[in-house]
């Protein structure tokens, strides 16, 4: 089965604990090169959309990952999640009931206080973004009123707001869709994740293979829709899908 809409929350591996809150201690993470070897291109429709979460630490890696999966990034700001503290809703509702928040300035002050203060080497982070990338001609936008910014309370570590999934459904309608790196179920979606007991498919990173040098020639690696020409000096070639065909071509 191929999917027209792929929604992914990659398990980024952070090296700076100031910037991420030690993600590896809360859930399984993967190196970028390992995620690139997931055969996502083999499950994507020839015309598909990828909506992928990333943080500012991984902006360039997110673009590389989308490209490795066969997608071209169209915007880095498909959605922006402004994170509120877990108890923000109850505190705001209490302020309204007690009439301690009575005008616009009070509201804006409260909203600013209730946005989280994460780590950061410059300013303190409180947002996370979803890029939009396409394969082929992508998908038709069915609803032109879908907004970018999502205000939502923070949940479990790395848990993303369901509102983004709902907006994607409204944006693209009833297409075949899958959520990658998921940890639960959602109606109308297929799922894959290494911590998800409800997987609908299995994705395994492709391994490396060693190809002996070929005199006066190059090696063309055909994997899915990829077509990578490698230099003679390279002895290892990355496989980006389950089946790889090798073809000798003129130098």
List each model region and its residues.
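Amphipathic alpha-helical oligomerization segments
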Residues: 215-227
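Basic/aromatic-rich interaction segments and small domains that mediate binding to polyanionic partners
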Residues: 231-247
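Polar/charged alpha-helical tracts
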Residues: 106-110, 224, 240
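Class I S-adenosyl-L-methionine-dependent methyltransferase catalytic core
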Residues: 1-218, 249-251
């Amino acid at each position: 089965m191929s999917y027209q809409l792929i929604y992914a929350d990659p398990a980024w591996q952070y090296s700076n604990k100031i910037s991420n809150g030690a993600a590896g201690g809360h859930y399984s993470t993967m190196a970028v090169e390992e995620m690139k070897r997931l055969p996502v291109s083999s499950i994507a429709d020839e015309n598909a959309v990828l909506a992928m979460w990333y943080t500012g630490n991984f902006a360039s890696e997110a673009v590389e990952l989308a490209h490795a999966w066969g997608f071209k990034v169209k915007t880095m700001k498909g959605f922006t999640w402004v994170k509120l503290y877990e108890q923000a809703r109850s505190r705001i509702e209490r302020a309204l009931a007690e009439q301690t928040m009575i005008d616009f300035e009070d509201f804006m002050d409260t909203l600013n206080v209730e946005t989280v203060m994460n780590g950061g080497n410059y300013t303190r982070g409180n947002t996370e973004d979803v890029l939009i990338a396409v394969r082929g001609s992508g998908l038709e936008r069915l609803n032109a009123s879908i907004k970018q910014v999502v205000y939502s309370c923070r949940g479990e570590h790395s848990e993303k707001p369901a509102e983004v999934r709902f907006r994607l459904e409204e944006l693209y309608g009833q297409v075949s869709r899958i959520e990658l790196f998921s940890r639960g179920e959602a109606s109308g979606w297929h799922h894959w994740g290494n911590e998800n007991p409800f997987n609908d498919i299995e994705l395994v990173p492709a391994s490396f293979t060693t190809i002996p040098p070929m005199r006066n020639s190059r090696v063309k690696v055909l994997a899915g829709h990829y077509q990578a020409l490698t230099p003679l000096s390279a002895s290892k070639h990355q496989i980006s899908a389950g089946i790889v065909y090798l073809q000798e071509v003129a130098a």
